[in-house]
Amino acid sequence: MKGLIIVGSAKVGSHTTALSQYLKGHFEEHDFDVEIFDLAEQPIHQLDVSGASNLSESYKNNLQTLKTKAREADFFVLGSPNYHGSYSGILKNALDHLTMDDFKMKPVGLIGNSGGIVSSEPLSHLRLIVRSLLGIAVPTQIATHDTDFKKLDDGTYYLANEEFQLRARLFVDQIISFVKNSPYEHLK
């Protein structure tokens, strides 16, 4: 089974990326092939349905990679920092490039991180988007705070909060259960 984690932070090495890497490790323990598409490291161009924009080749290539991975995915995890009480614009842009066919009846996990006030509002907003894309947002979600992470000597963040480590396992188990036991397989 294949999964795609889309990280919607504009910061390379973000807390959202660290949480995504933690989750990836747990999926891999269950022999799932999971890739992280980090929009800070692989930026894509703004959606332009007119075709008037002069697009860079690297942005075009990144977008094609995202679209291919989305088509191949059996499930998604969407991750975003809390930007002014909602999810990031770059994640919205990435989702605008994808279609209902990419998400139709596939489980979607939602994760977010806040630097200020802890809030699950970005995840509530994403839940509506997932429904509009015909995906199935799983009930368990993860909303962390910067203080739930520690830094390694090289500056890389890692999830240190044991409560969220436990929640991450529940989150992964729930997505795996949805993937393996989907009553909607015939609707894809």
Curated annotation (Swiss-Prot):
Function (record text): Catalyzes the reductive cleavage of azo bond in aromatic azo compounds to the corresponding amines. Requires NADPH, but not NADH, as an electron donor for its activity.
The keyword Oxidoreductase belongs to this UniProt entry's keyword annotation: yes
Any Pfam family the entry gives: FMN_red
Source taxon at top rank: Bacteria
EC assignment: 1.7.-.-
Subunit text: Homotetramer.
Molecular function as annotated in GO: FMN binding; oxidoreductase activity
Protein name from the UniProt record: FMN-dependent NADPH-azoreductase
Name of the gene: azo1
Organism, as annotated: Staphylococcus saprophyticus subsp. saprophyticus (strain ATCC 15305 / DSM 20229 / NCIMB 8711 / NCTC 7292 / S-41)
Cofactor dependency: FMN
Family (UniProt): Belongs to the azoreductase type 2 family.
Listed GO CC annotations: cytosol
Keywords: Flavoprotein, FMN, NADP, Oxidoreductase
Coiled-coil annotated residue ranges, if any: none
